Amino acid sequence: RYDSIADAYQSGEYEKIYDRYIKSLAEYNKLSAEKKQYIGKPTEPMGKWNFRRPVGLSETMLNVVSPYTLKGFIFYQGESNTARGAQYRKLFPAMIKEWRASWGQGDIPFLFVQLPRFETKTRYWNELREAQYLTSLHVKNTGMAVAFDQGNPKDIHPIVKDTVGWRLAQMALGK
């Protein structure tokens, strides 16, 4: 699928598709504001301006702040990768390496939050937690704040976040 999108870039077709999307979005916003009729919100086409493209999040959010100096990273994410626990064993360390390289500050601290407890019928969450744990063991200057005990079996987002924040703070302060 991505190859066909990449081919559209080369042919100039993507710009035409994106222009149609922008016009449709303007029409959607106008009709929504006027509440004249319900129409479905247009979907942004996959392509070079879509943040969901490969490395899109990095290019649209991280590259704009990477020139600034920082003391370390705090990363709290992973739910969208739960079905790829085995891949995450390589992807997560690679992401850490890439972020550190983008900032050019060596092996600055990279702290992250383990996925919390969440009741699911698959083993995926456990596999991803294991990949996170292995990363904390094998990637230099990383720390994992355990969140399993803070999770809510019925809600993907723990209600009480101060314990996880405290754990991250203790690691950041070297305690």
Task: Walk through the language-model features, giving the residues of each.
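Cell-envelope and extracellular/periplasmic
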Residues: 1-175
